[in-house]
């Protein structure tokens, strides 16, 4: 496979250095390790909820301001993957590495300066900065995911499950790191976002240097004409690749035609649209639960209740990513279809919604804990199984475009179900503080039941679409 002009010039010097300095096995293994580290780094955006209190205390942000920043980041992260996928398929994951660097560093430096000033001179610029951070997050995560998929196209555990698991671990690790005293204001005690964001800018510069190296390896793989470097793992050197006449290494028109033919076939495949709808419904519901977990817990158990359900959600999500990848590989080895895993996850999600509705009539944290664990298990599993099936059905050559398109589902789904939850909550539920010393008075948790009734129906529809598509498509039954 040939390289585009952009990919050629962005990777030429790195390819030359790697080929002249290291054995192929060293390059291959190091690239995989760097990609996993990149996945962990990309997930730091999910810690955005801990910024709310410092913003409110120092910058005077209202709840609406904070939610606008959240929305900007999420839209940037979820709406751009189709374009990022096309860029990666056309010019290699190295282009995503550069985009992440260009997005992360200036944005975090600006946000750091705003927090240090103690006032926001232009809130619109902060919104734009967070939208760019969201885009950079998707760029870095896709960069890592696509690199792993190119390195190990034959094993979903290594190509999909490992990077998605690392992405899930990110918030768990990051939350522990920012507990260090260095990240907190000595005078006021709250999280000093000026220090946090500056640290992020420095950290992502270091990550960029590593990913620039790892993504250049994918260019070497293309030039070797092998989609599976493990097949030639014993190859001593890659010197000959770089010594070829560079005029023969640019993307040929024939290869372009074949690539765009694959893209057209994907967009004409009804299975792709079924996947998109299922992801919109299922991931939208899961994002709604994840976003409003603290609010829901307070509504059911009362103000001041334990929020350990957040940790349970994260841990079960991370575990599910790893287990799902393991089961996908086992199913592949045994020649079993993998679509039942999607059906299992959707059934689990429906069960979680039913438990939540039941918990609203029983003031017992056990039900919320169980629902949180099941939802986390489903959330992590779906985010692992969907890309694995995408890779299996449409191949690694258009994987970025295909899975990037599917990410539109969570983008619109999370917005729709999140707004629905907010509307039901604001219309039916009350939370007032009659006096400064009084405890908040909340209405019955049953007030939010309509939101979860609707989410349960949405999951049933997603399950029905999945079953119908499986029955109609022999290719999907054997996927």
Swiss-Prot record:
Q: Which UniProt keywords apply?
A: Glycoprotein, Membrane, Transmembrane, Transmembrane helix, Transport, Vacuole
Regions crossing the membrane: 32-52, 68-88, 95-115, 127-147, 158-178, 193-213, 266-286, 309-328, 339-359, 368-388, 398-418, 448-468
Q: Which residues are glycosylated?
A: 29, 295, 364
**Sorted alphabetically, which InterPro entries does this protein's record hold?**
MFS (IPR011701), MFS_trans_sf (IPR036259)
Q: Please, which domain of life does this record's source organism belong to?
A: Eukaryota
Q: What is its main location?
A: membrane
The record's GO CC annotations read: fungal-type vacuole membrane
Question: What does the UniProt entry say about where the protein is found?
Answer: Vacuole membrane
**Its membrane topology:** Multi-pass membrane protein
Q: Is Transmembrane given among the entry's keywords?
A: yes
Which SUPFAM superfamilies does this entry report, sorted A to Z?
MFS general substrate transporter (SSF103473)
> What are this entry's molecular-function GO terms?
transmembrane transporter activity
Please state which protein family the record places this protein in.
Answer: Belongs to the major facilitator superfamily.
What the protein does comes down to: Probable transporter.
What's the protein here called?
A: Probable transporter MCH1
Source organism per UniProt: Kluyveromyces lactis (strain ATCC 8585 / CBS 2359 / DSM 70799 / NBRC 1267 / NRRL Y-1140 / WM37) (Yeast)
Provide the taxonomic classification. Answer: Eukaryota, Fungi, Dikarya, Ascomycota, Saccharomycotina
């Amino acid at each position: 496979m040939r390289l585009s002009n952009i990919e050629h010039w962005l990777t030429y010097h790195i390819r030359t250095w790697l080929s002249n300095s290291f054995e192929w096995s060293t390059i291959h293994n190091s690239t995989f390790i760097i990609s996993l580290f990149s996945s962990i780094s990309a997930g730091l955006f999910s810690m955005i909820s801990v910024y709310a209190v410092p913003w409110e205390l120092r910058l005077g942000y209202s709840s609406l301001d904070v939610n606008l920043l959240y929305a900007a980041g999420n839209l940037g992260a979820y709406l751009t993957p189709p374009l990022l996928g096309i860029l990666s398929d056309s010019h290699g994951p190295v282009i995503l590495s550069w985009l992440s660097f260009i997005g992360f560093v200036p944005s975090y430096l600006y946000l750091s300066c705003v927090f240090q000033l103690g006032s926001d001179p232009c809130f619109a610029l902060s919104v734009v900065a967070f939208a760019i951070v969201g885009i950079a997050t998707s760029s870095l995560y896709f960069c890592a995911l696509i690199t792993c998929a190119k390195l190990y196209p034959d094993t979903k555990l290594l190509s999909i499950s490992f990077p998605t698991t690392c992405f899930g671990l990110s918030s768990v690790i990051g939350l522990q790191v920012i507990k260090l005293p260095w990240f907190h204001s000595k005078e006021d005690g709250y999280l000093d976002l000026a220090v946090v964001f500056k640290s992020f800018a420095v950290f992502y510069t270091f990550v960029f240097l590593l990913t620039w190296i790892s993504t250049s390896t994918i260019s070497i793989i293309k030039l070797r004409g092998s989609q599976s470097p493990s097949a030639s793992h014993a190859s001593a050197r890659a010197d000959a690749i770089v010594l070829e006449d560079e005029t023969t290494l640019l993307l040929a028109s024939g290869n372009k035609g074949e690539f765009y033919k694959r893209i057209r076939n994907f967009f004409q495949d009804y299975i792709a649209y079924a996947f998109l709808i299922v992801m919109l419904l299922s991931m939208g519901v899961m994002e709604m639960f994840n976003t409003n977990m603290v609010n829901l817990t307070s509504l059911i158990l009362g103000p001041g209740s334990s929020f350990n359900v957040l940790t349970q959600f994260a841990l079960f999500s991370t575990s599910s990513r790893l287990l799902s990848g393991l089961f996908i590989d086992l199913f592949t080895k045994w020649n079993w279809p993998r679509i039942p895993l999607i059906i299992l996850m959707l059934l689990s999600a429906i069960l979680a919604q039913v438990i939540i509705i039941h918990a609203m009539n029983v003031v017992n944290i056990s039900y919320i804990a169980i629902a949180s664990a099941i939802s986390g298990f489903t959330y992590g599993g779906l985010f692992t199984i969907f890309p694995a099936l995408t890779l299996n059905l449409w191949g690694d050559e258009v994987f970025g475009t295909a899975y990037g398109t599917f990410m539109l589902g969570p983008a619109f789904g999370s917005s729709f179900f999140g707004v629905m939850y907010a509307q039901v909550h604001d219309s039916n539920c009350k939370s007032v503080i009659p006096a400064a010393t009084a405890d908040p008075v909340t209405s019955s948790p049953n007030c939010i039941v309509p939101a979860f009734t609707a989410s349960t129906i949405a999951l049933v529809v997603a399950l029905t679409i999945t079953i119908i598509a499986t029955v109609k498509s022999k290719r999907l039954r054997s996927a």
